């Protein structure tokens, strides 16, 4: 395991998550993408939360986007389905048990809910405890404007 990268902020987190994942994967690294909150489900996302299925996918493909399904009621309210992140105990096990196959875990951490900025609070951003690097994404479209609630 080289790094566990958590990406927080607004205006481009998902794009950055996928760009980093593609670049690391292209360079021959094993990559797992997940979230600590909610994230849109992409094609070929594994929602099984099954250690062996995730392990096999990472070993076979060198890449896996994984999480668990949000309840059907919440999914139906979205135009595109969203997922929650992997349970921390499962993520811990994948990191611990796959040191040769899993090089990078890239986590879309807490977001700003379509605002350009969100102040940190006691319980946010939601950052995975084994994170080695945090990247803060800030949209510049509101540069120069006052921050308010």
Predicted regions and their residues:
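Walker A (P-loop) phosphate-binding motif
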Residues: 1-27
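N-terminal phosphate/diphosphate-binding loop that engages ATP/GTP or pyrophosphate donors
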Residues: 21-73, 77, 81
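Phosphate-binding/switch loop-helix module in NTP-utilizing enzymes
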Residues: 69-119
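A short secondary-structure junction signal
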Residues: 116-121, 145-149
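Inter-motif core of Ras-like GTPase G domains
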Residues: 121-143
């Amino acid at each position: 395991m080289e790094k566990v990268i958590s990406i927080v902020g607004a205006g481009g987190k998902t794009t950055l998550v996928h760009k980093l994942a593609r670049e690391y994967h292209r360079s021959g690294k094993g990559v797992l993408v997940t979230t600590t909150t909610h994230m849109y489900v992409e094609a070929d996302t594994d929602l099984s939360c099954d250690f062996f299925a995730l392990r096999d996918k990472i070993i076979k493909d060198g890449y896996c986007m994984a999480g668990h399904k949000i309840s059907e009621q919440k999914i139906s309210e979205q135009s595109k389905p969203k997922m929650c992140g992997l349970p921390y105990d499962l993520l811990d096990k994948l990191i611990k048990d796959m040191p040769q196959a899993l090089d990078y875990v890239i986590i879309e951490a807490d977001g700003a809910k379509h605002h350009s900025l969100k102040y940190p609070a006691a319980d946010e951003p939601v950052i995975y405890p084994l994170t080695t690097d945090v990247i803060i994404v800030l949209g510049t479209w509101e540069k120069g404007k006052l921050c308010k609630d």
